[in-house]
Protein backbone atom coordinates (compact mmCIF):
# COMPACT_ATOMS: atom_id res chain seq x y z
CA UNK A 1 0.00 0.00 0.00
CA UNK A 2 1.29 3.45 -0.93
CA UNK A 3 2.05 5.92 1.86
CA UNK A 4 0.42 8.71 -0.18
CA UNK A 5 -1.95 8.39 -3.10
CA UNK A 6 -3.90 10.89 -5.18
CA UNK A 7 -6.85 9.36 -7.02
CA UNK A 8 -8.56 11.35 -9.81
CA UNK A 9 -7.55 14.53 -7.98
CA UNK A 10 -8.89 17.84 -9.28
CA UNK A 11 -8.64 21.36 -7.91
CA UNK A 12 -10.84 24.34 -8.75
CA UNK A 13 -10.21 28.00 -7.96
CA UNK A 14 -13.81 29.07 -8.46
CA UNK A 15 -14.50 28.27 -12.11
CA UNK A 16 -10.82 27.78 -12.93
CA UNK A 17 -9.96 24.08 -13.24
CA UNK A 18 -6.28 24.18 -12.26
CA UNK A 19 -5.50 20.52 -11.53
CA UNK A 20 -7.16 17.90 -13.70
CA UNK A 21 -7.54 14.25 -12.81
CA UNK A 22 -4.14 13.62 -11.24
CA UNK A 23 -3.30 10.05 -10.24
CA UNK A 24 -0.02 9.59 -8.42
CA UNK A 25 1.48 7.72 -5.49
CA UNK A 26 4.49 7.78 -3.19
CA UNK A 27 5.60 4.57 -1.48
CA UNK A 28 7.08 4.41 2.00
CA UNK A 29 10.77 5.34 1.87
CA UNK A 30 10.67 6.72 -1.66
CA UNK A 31 11.85 10.08 -2.92
CA UNK A 32 9.56 11.30 -5.70
CA UNK A 33 9.67 14.54 -7.68
CA UNK A 34 6.96 16.48 -9.49
CA UNK A 35 8.37 18.61 -12.30
CA UNK A 36 6.80 21.00 -14.78
CA UNK A 37 6.79 24.59 -15.92
CA UNK A 38 5.54 27.54 -13.89
CA UNK A 39 1.76 27.47 -13.46
CA UNK A 40 1.46 23.74 -14.19
CA UNK A 41 -0.39 23.08 -10.91
CA UNK A 42 2.48 21.63 -8.90
CA UNK A 43 2.23 23.95 -5.89
CA UNK A 44 -1.58 23.65 -5.78
CA UNK A 45 -1.19 19.87 -5.67
CA UNK A 46 1.38 20.04 -2.87
CA UNK A 47 -0.62 22.52 -0.80
CA UNK A 48 -3.75 20.42 -1.22
CA UNK A 49 -1.91 17.42 0.21
CA UNK A 50 -0.78 19.43 3.24
CA UNK A 51 -4.19 21.01 3.84
CA UNK A 52 -3.27 24.55 2.81
CA UNK A 53 -5.81 25.02 0.01
CA UNK A 54 -9.53 25.62 0.44
CA UNK A 55 -11.06 22.19 0.80
CA UNK A 56 -14.15 23.10 -1.23
CA UNK A 57 -11.96 23.33 -4.34
CA UNK A 58 -11.01 19.65 -4.18
CA UNK A 59 -12.57 16.80 -6.15
CA UNK A 60 -11.25 13.26 -5.94
CA UNK A 61 -9.23 11.61 -3.19
CA UNK A 62 -6.03 12.27 -1.25
CA UNK A 63 -5.15 9.13 0.71
CA UNK A 64 -2.45 8.96 3.40
CA UNK A 65 -1.70 5.67 5.17
CA UNK A 66 -4.98 4.31 3.81
CA UNK A 67 -7.07 7.19 5.15
CA UNK A 68 -8.85 9.78 2.99
CA UNK A 69 -7.63 13.24 4.03
CA UNK A 70 -8.90 15.52 1.26
CA UNK A 71 -11.27 17.23 3.71
CA UNK A 72 -8.69 17.67 6.49
CA UNK A 73 -7.48 21.11 7.48
CA UNK A 74 -3.75 21.80 7.73
CA UNK A 75 -3.37 21.20 11.47
CA UNK A 76 -5.03 17.80 11.17
CA UNK A 77 -2.81 16.83 8.22
CA UNK A 78 0.26 17.90 10.24
CA UNK A 79 -0.89 15.70 13.13
CA UNK A 80 -0.83 12.70 10.78
CA UNK A 81 2.87 13.25 10.06
CA UNK A 82 2.96 15.35 6.88
CA UNK A 83 5.24 18.41 6.97
CA UNK A 84 5.83 20.92 4.20
CA UNK A 85 8.64 23.35 3.50
CA UNK A 86 6.86 25.99 1.44
CA UNK A 87 7.96 27.73 -1.75
CA UNK A 88 9.80 30.92 -0.85
CA UNK A 89 10.80 29.51 2.56
CA UNK A 90 8.10 31.36 4.60
CA UNK A 91 10.13 31.45 7.78
CA UNK A 92 9.25 33.75 10.70
CA UNK A 93 11.53 36.69 9.95
CA UNK A 94 11.09 38.32 13.38
CA UNK A 95 11.90 35.13 15.29
CA UNK A 96 15.37 33.72 15.91
CA UNK A 97 16.61 30.56 14.23
CA UNK A 98 16.00 28.61 17.43
CA UNK A 99 12.50 30.03 17.86
CA UNK A 100 11.67 29.11 14.25
CA UNK A 101 12.76 25.54 14.90
CA UNK A 102 10.69 25.34 18.07
CA UNK A 103 7.65 26.40 16.04
CA UNK A 104 8.14 23.27 13.97
CA UNK A 105 7.64 21.18 17.11
CA UNK A 106 4.54 23.01 18.35
CA UNK A 107 2.41 19.87 18.11
CA UNK A 108 4.44 18.09 20.78
CA UNK A 109 6.70 18.63 23.79
CA UNK A 110 8.91 15.52 23.90
CA UNK A 111 12.60 15.38 22.93
CA UNK A 112 12.56 18.80 21.28
CA UNK A 113 16.18 19.50 22.22
CA UNK A 114 17.37 16.19 20.76
CA UNK A 115 15.56 16.90 17.49
CA UNK A 116 16.98 20.42 17.40
CA UNK A 117 20.47 19.04 17.92
CA UNK A 118 19.94 16.75 14.92
CA UNK A 119 18.88 19.72 12.78
CA UNK A 120 21.99 21.63 13.90
CA UNK A 121 24.14 18.61 13.09
CA UNK A 122 22.65 18.47 9.59
CA UNK A 123 22.88 22.24 9.06
CA UNK A 124 25.85 23.53 11.13
CA UNK A 125 25.30 27.07 9.87
CA UNK A 126 22.01 27.20 11.74
CA UNK A 127 23.83 26.39 14.97
CA UNK A 128 26.23 29.26 14.33
CA UNK A 129 23.25 31.58 13.81
CA UNK A 130 20.81 30.14 16.34
CA UNK A 131 20.19 33.51 18.04
CA UNK A 132 20.02 35.46 14.77
CA UNK A 133 16.66 36.68 13.41
CA UNK A 134 15.37 34.57 10.54
CA UNK A 135 14.92 37.58 8.28
CA UNK A 136 18.64 38.40 8.42
CA UNK A 137 19.78 35.01 7.07
CA UNK A 138 20.95 34.44 3.51
CA UNK A 139 18.60 32.69 1.08
CA UNK A 140 20.41 29.38 1.49
CA UNK A 141 20.33 29.63 5.28
CA UNK A 142 16.62 30.43 5.18
CA UNK A 143 16.03 27.31 3.07
CA UNK A 144 17.98 25.24 5.59
CA UNK A 145 15.86 26.77 8.36
CA UNK A 146 12.61 26.05 6.52
CA UNK A 147 13.66 22.42 6.04
CA UNK A 148 14.88 22.17 9.63
CA UNK A 149 11.58 23.52 10.92
CA UNK A 150 9.69 20.89 8.89
CA UNK A 151 11.99 18.15 10.23
CA UNK A 152 11.24 19.24 13.80
CA UNK A 153 7.78 17.82 13.21
CA UNK A 154 9.36 14.33 12.77
CA UNK A 155 7.40 13.81 9.55
CA UNK A 156 6.55 10.51 7.95
CA UNK A 157 6.24 12.44 4.68
CA UNK A 158 8.29 15.56 3.92
CA UNK A 159 6.97 17.86 1.20
CA UNK A 160 9.40 20.35 -0.34
CA UNK A 161 8.23 23.07 -2.72
CA UNK A 162 10.97 24.54 -4.93
CA UNK A 163 13.89 24.03 -2.49
CA UNK A 164 16.42 25.44 -4.99
CA UNK A 165 14.47 28.62 -5.79
CA UNK A 166 16.76 31.65 -6.03
CA UNK A 167 19.83 29.88 -4.63
CA UNK A 168 23.41 29.79 -5.91
CA UNK A 169 24.52 26.47 -7.49
CA UNK A 170 26.85 25.55 -4.60
CA UNK A 171 24.05 26.07 -2.07
CA UNK A 172 21.63 24.08 -4.23
CA UNK A 173 24.10 21.18 -4.20
CA UNK A 174 24.30 21.40 -0.41
CA UNK A 175 20.50 21.50 -0.03
CA UNK A 176 19.96 18.45 -2.22
CA UNK A 177 22.73 16.55 -0.46
CA UNK A 178 20.72 17.11 2.73
CA UNK A 179 17.47 16.03 1.03
CA UNK A 180 19.15 12.81 -0.09
CA UNK A 181 20.46 12.13 3.42
CA UNK A 182 17.03 12.79 4.95
CA UNK A 183 15.51 10.23 2.61
CA UNK A 184 18.28 7.68 3.20
CA UNK A 185 17.62 7.95 6.93
CA UNK A 186 14.03 6.81 6.37
CA UNK A 187 11.88 9.87 5.69
CA UNK A 188 9.68 9.66 2.60
CA UNK A 189 10.08 12.76 0.41
CA UNK A 190 7.92 14.34 -2.29
CA UNK A 191 9.30 17.51 -3.83
CA UNK A 192 8.41 20.02 -6.52
CA UNK A 193 11.33 21.48 -8.42
CA UNK A 194 11.66 23.63 -11.56
CA UNK A 195 15.31 22.67 -11.94
CA UNK A 196 14.41 19.41 -13.64
CA UNK A 197 17.97 18.20 -14.09
CA UNK A 198 18.65 18.35 -10.36
CA UNK A 199 15.22 16.91 -9.53
CA UNK A 200 15.58 13.91 -11.83
CA UNK A 201 19.17 13.39 -10.72
CA UNK A 202 18.09 13.17 -7.08
CA UNK A 203 14.72 11.39 -6.86
CA UNK A 204 13.83 7.75 -7.50
CA UNK A 205 10.71 8.41 -9.60
CA UNK A 206 9.24 11.45 -11.28
CA UNK A 207 5.94 12.83 -12.52
CA UNK A 208 5.76 15.43 -15.28
CA UNK A 209 2.92 17.96 -14.99
CA UNK A 210 1.63 20.20 -17.78
CA UNK A 211 -1.37 22.55 -17.50
CA UNK A 212 -2.74 20.70 -14.48
CA UNK A 213 -2.33 17.16 -15.81
CA UNK A 214 0.22 14.40 -15.29
CA UNK A 215 1.49 13.71 -18.80
CA UNK A 216 4.30 11.29 -17.95
CA UNK A 217 5.63 9.24 -15.04
CA UNK A 218 8.60 6.90 -14.84
CA UNK A 219 11.83 6.22 -13.01
CA UNK A 220 14.06 9.28 -12.98
CA UNK A 221 16.71 7.33 -14.88
CA UNK A 222 14.25 6.81 -17.74
CA UNK A 223 12.90 10.37 -17.65
CA UNK A 224 16.44 11.74 -17.91
CA UNK A 225 16.91 9.95 -21.23
CA UNK A 226 13.40 10.57 -22.59
CA UNK A 227 13.64 12.79 -25.70
CA UNK A 228 10.45 14.75 -24.93
CA UNK A 229 11.60 15.46 -21.38
CA UNK A 230 15.06 16.46 -22.59
CA UNK A 231 13.61 18.91 -25.12
CA UNK A 232 11.05 20.44 -22.76
CA UNK A 233 12.89 20.51 -19.43
CA UNK A 234 16.57 19.64 -19.77
CA UNK A 235 17.68 22.04 -22.48
CA UNK A 236 18.25 19.22 -24.92
Locations of regions flagged by a protein language model:
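Glycine-rich phosphate-binding loops of nucleotide-dependent enzymes
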Residues: 2-236
